Amino acid sequence: MATTASLHLHLHLLLSSSRRRCRLLVPRAHTDSISTGRRRFIADTATASAAAAVGPLVLPRTPLARADQPPSLSEWERVLLPIDPGVVLLDIAFVPDDPSHGFLLGTRQTILETKNGGNTWFPRSIPSAEDEDFNYRFNSVSFMGKEGWIIGKPAILLHTSDAGDSWERIPLSAQLPGNMVYIKATGEQSAEMVTDEGAIYVTSNRGYNWKAAVQETVSATLNRTVSSGISGASYYTGTFNTVNRSPDGRYVAVSSRGNFYLTWEPGQPFWQPHNRAVARRIQNMGWRADGGLWLLVRGGGLFLSKGSGFQFFYRGLNDAHAISYLHPPNQITEDFEEASVQSRGFGILDVGYRSKDEAWAAGGSGVLLKTTNGGKTWVRDKAADNIAANLYSVKFLGDNKGYVLGNDGVLLRYVG
């Protein structure tokens, strides 16, 4: 097939280097003045009402913010950013060797940098990303040690080996199938890159050469196996709507129309398609802290896979410590159960786990939900209801370092 041949043709992509506070005062009665007259009571009440009219009543945990100060939330605070209101924030990462140093990406050629743990951010100019008349959408950033990677659309790949002090641009082949949507630093001079057509590439020499980890794009796989039994998969020509990677290198992706999903794990030659377990179309999917899957549907529903989501098949070997997999390597359970959520009818767009039990979900019109039982039940953080933005992404980079990314330049930081 032409698509397969094209992917093999680029198995190795040869790349060259480059407040005022006011309390409601109610007079306290003295023991010797219990017989205070009706006239005195009316006067005291009027005084209290006038005092209340002078300034607003301040509620605990939600102080009124000045015009130049962002509002406080129960467990999150908003961080003001020096960017245009229309920017959508897309990814964030910190340098492992310097946790106070991080980068924030977005649309409209947005790259922001912090050197104080995310308290303040400033624009970062990268000359090699400004040579052309493109308005880049920077999709993904990842660090390991001092080595980092940034990818964007139109196709652009940036690499640093000094914790982001300097960046070099690495040219890419014009024949790369699809748009780059995700990159993960995996080791010294090594990274893994994914496109929205399902191509996965790995490099071990700073991006100068890339090797295909799958034999063909998703559309080629699905159109070759038209009898797969996956609803909406036959004659598939779309791309991924979302793709998420587990800590151990497994991927789950949602088709562009949300009518099915796909999984892949290291060693598989192809992506594996799966029927969606619910009637409504899928919005997003990702990995729980226990290894299972969470699934969001359009309209605000949230589902959790039963068990860990994976059922492994082992082949008996002479060496009892060796494990291999039958084909297909894994069977993903398609058995999901719905969780109890209060999203006010707004769609939930992403979920991020802080621990095995605690997670946060975010969505349209400032919806922010919390679970403390692994996702079975969720409670809305009402303090976030006044945020006039869609919250697209929840990212926990450690137990106490978490961020919510939204449109209109909205960034929330976890303060616990």
From Swiss-Prot:
Cellular localization per UniProt: Plastid, Chloroplast thylakoid lumen
The entry's keywords: Chloroplast, Photosynthesis, Photosystem II, Plastid, Thylakoid, Transit peptide
Annotated GO biological process: photosynthesis
One Pfam assignment: PSII_BNR
Transmembrane annotation, as ranges: none
Chain segment of the transit peptide: 1-36, 37-67
One GO cellular component term: photosystem II
Matches recorded under PANTHER family: PHOTOSYSTEM II STABILITY/ASSEMBLY FACTOR HCF136, CHLOROPLASTIC, PHOTOSYSTEM II STABILITY_ASSEMBLY FACTOR HCF136, CHLOROPLASTIC
Family: Belongs to the Ycf48 family.
Domain comment (free text): A 7-bladed beta-propeller torus, about 54 by 55 Angstroms, with a depth of about 25 Angstroms and a central pore.
NCBIfam families registered for this protein in UniProt: PRK13684.1 (NF010237)
Annotated function: Essential for photosystem II (PSII) biogenesis; required for assembly of an early intermediate in PSII assembly that includes D2 (psbD) and cytochrome b559.
Record's protein name: Photosystem II stability/assembly factor HCF136, chloroplastic
Taxonomic lineage: Eukaryota, Viridiplantae, Streptophyta, Embryophyta, Tracheophyta
